[in-house]
Design a protein with these regions (language model features):
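Short alpha-helix boundary/capping and kink motifs at helix termini
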Residues: 1-55, 59, 65
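Basic- and aromatic-enriched surface patches that contact anionic nucleotides/nucleic acids
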Residues: 51-136
């Protein structure tokens, strides 16, 4: 199966994540050549409310940004995800002034803090959405 990728300016992608895991960033920067978009696997994006949004790959995109790259290879998000949850995450980002991956600079956290401040927050939000939908 051939997956079509294209290059997109990092400034044109809305993050859906408030923080970057320092540990994951370190692994990515050691594993891939982050000096150019072809050195990193493509990141999935989707058009949500008129804007291109990262659904995953925030750390890869941020690693490219840190190395001075201006673009990232993207693929269209292949899965049907919980778009209500992503809208909540994007709203959190906008409330914190995060409108592109460069805005995540200074928001890198060690693993324990990343778990507490981001992953647990997302889990609670997903549980609340499930409760509101009558799923929980």
């Amino acid at each position: 199966v051939t997956v079509l990728t294209r290059l997109v300016d990092l400034r044109d992608l809305q993050p859906s994540q408030l923080y970057i895991s320092e540990a994951k960033l370190d692994r990515i920067e050691r594993k891939f050549d982050t000096s150019h978009p072809q050195g990193v696997p493509p990141v999935p994006i989707v058009r949500l409310d008129g804007r291109w949004m990262l659904t995953d790959g925030h750390t890869r995109a941020f690693a490219l940004y840190r190395s001075g790259a201006r673009e990232v290879r993207v693929i269209d998000e292949p899965d049907a995800l919980d778009w209500a949850a992503y809208r909540v995450c994007v709203d959190w980002c906008l409330d914190e002034g995060i409108e592109w991956v460069g805005d995540l600079a200074g928001r890198m956290l060690p693993p324990r803090e990343f778990e507490q401040l981001w992953l647990l927050r997302c889990r609670r939000m997903q549980e609340e959405l499930a409760r509101l939908r009558g799923e929980g």
